[in-house]
Amino acid sequence: MSDVLRLDREMMALALQQARASLDAGGVPVGAVLASGDEVIAAGHNERVQHGDPVAHGEISALRNAGRRASYGDTTMYTTLSPCQMCTGAILLFQIPRVVVGEARTFAGDLDFLRSKGVEIVLLDDLGCVAAMEEFQARYPQVWSEDIGGR
């Protein structure tokens, strides 16, 4: 296993911990980590249910927790689920050059769109990420349908 893939898997494990924290609180299990190399800048998870905030997706929470930055040009966004249109927009707005996705089985997002804008996409197809979303979708189908799952 290459050093890059090893780091990607380590960071995804941190993002999955965030997703599990959201699931344990009755929320949507999407976790995210914003990193520069092996340095974690910030982490977050979906808090839409917990805070009644429709834009508190995992990637957005990680960006909020990162605070202001002059540039995101050296960062990677690790997210347990393929980004929705809103989170895709944030990735493009802040010019995050690399996104590592835990899984795109339970929600495909539009990874080709990100690629077409020059974003490097790595899809890990992590079974832990898949299991967390499948558990959530089975336990809370109505909550999922209120969010991106309703499409």
Task: Please identify what each model-predicted range represents.
Residues 1-22, 92-151:
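Zinc-dependent deaminase
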